[in-house]
């Protein structure tokens, strides 16, 4: 928000391109953020956005699990209240941290569990793709020096990322 970005959830990756085209059509700068896409889908989205930020995993949960240190996953697993159905499935969630945390994130999708996980990470535990994407967005949205009155207008579509 401080960068002048408006976040819009397209609802699914297939709707990112059409929604981006709508906002570009009214003169907005559009950044697209999404999960790994096939070549055709990625190309279609890229044509409609000013810059595409696509991570290398099929889902955001996969990004967190594959690109966060195991210690961060264990730390978070010890902090959360496990739902009863997952306690039954994973009596010792730490013994299979990848599977248990995937199940947890999947069961809490849309409830802020991924953001909650990231909020307890130190900077070194946050996946590099997230840090690099944030750096690029910040750099792209910095007001031009000498033009303090400039307003940055950008739309970010995060699709199913968060």
Task: Enumerate the predicted regions with their spans.
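Acidic, Mg2+-coordinating catalytic modules of nucleic-acid enzymes
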Residues: 1-162
